[in-house]
Amino acid sequence: MNVAVFCSANNALDPEFFTLTRRLGEWIGRGGHTLVYGGCDMGLMECVAKAVHDSGGRVIGVIPIRLEKGGHVSSYIDVQILCETLGERKQLMLDRSDVVVALPGGIGTLDEIFSVAAEGTLAYHDKRVIVYDMKGFWNGLESLLDGLQQKGVMRGDYHSRITFAHDEDELLRMLA
């Protein structure tokens, strides 16, 4: 299985996020799965790539040329795919993945979550995003989406495109 992971490239995060991210990476690697991610050598991105690599899994890094020129490419990548834009990176990652997981992240991660969900709503693909709600990180997003659903501004039930996993066991059940 190819697992796309969207997440933060920030190093200044809760240390427990790194622990949980490492465990996900180990699960991906030990299971013989492939990580598809943004290729950066910082934050949770580097953490998950290292864990997959060290656990025997394969790592595909989809890297914007701007990042590569800046010297922020992970050394744990087995297959490197260069692209021009963030939009192109999202599409290349989606095309190469069977399932999508979002870990804690910022504006870029939100963009990735919503792009996958919006494209799925319009039948460009049939994938959903599993949002791993580490320590309640995504509680505000889940509340926002529930509120939008209640107000009737969303077509259909958003849960068919975005699902929240509130702990590691729930996440691994969804991935199995």
Regions found by a protein language model. Give the residues of each.
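Active-site/ligand-binding-proximal alpha/beta "capping" segment
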Residues: E88-A123, I130
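Short, structured loop/turn "capping" segments at alpha-beta junctions
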Residues: V59, Y124-K127
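Flexible, glycine/proline-enriched loop segments at strand-loop-helix junctions
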Residues: L103-P104, R128-Y132, H159-I162
